[in-house]
Amino acid sequence: HADRAIEAVIQAFGLAGARIGTLIADARIVSLLRSVLPPYAIAQPCIEAAQQALAPAQQRLARERVAAIVRERARLSAALAGLAGVTHVWPSDANFLLVEFDEPARALSRLREARLLVRDFRDRPGLERALRITVGSPEQNDRLVRSLAC
């Protein structure tokens, strides 16, 4: 839908909590939004943070972080797929993986014992055996895989 494409400034720039983004939309939608937004809808500290985060040097760092996450996501996905008890790892373009386990409660218990937090998706229809695992550093991901391999 070309008239409703919304693009947020992503976490790669370290601005997830700044509530800054862009809107690409039909002129009528933009006009409507402008009519309801306060005159200073974005706080000055947020504007300054965005300007700093989007500077060329910071953009290079963000691209490097994204590349590292992509590499680590592929490595973690392969490691998880090779574990006994993992029945499916969904493909992902995000910084997390959705993983199905034959015994998700057991996997969750092991991860909690290791003081590793994951998102429990078992209460969602069709995902009754799934946990969402955020891609961490290589060391964090190795620890996660070791915890599940026991």
Language-model-detected regions and their locations in the chain:
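A short linear hydrophobic-aromatic micro-motif
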Residues: A5, G85-H88, L116-R122
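Short hydrophobic/aromatic beta-strand micro-patches
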Residues: I24, L98-E100, T134-G136
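Conserved PLP-binding catalytic core of the aspartate aminotransferase-like
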Residues: I69-V70, A74, L80-A114
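Active-site phosphate-binding strand-loop segment of PLP-dependent enzymes
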Residues: H1-A2
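PLP-dependent aminotransferase class I/II
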Residues: V9-G82
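Short acidic/glycine-enriched loop/turn segments that link adjacent beta-strands
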Residues: G17, D93-A94, P125-R129
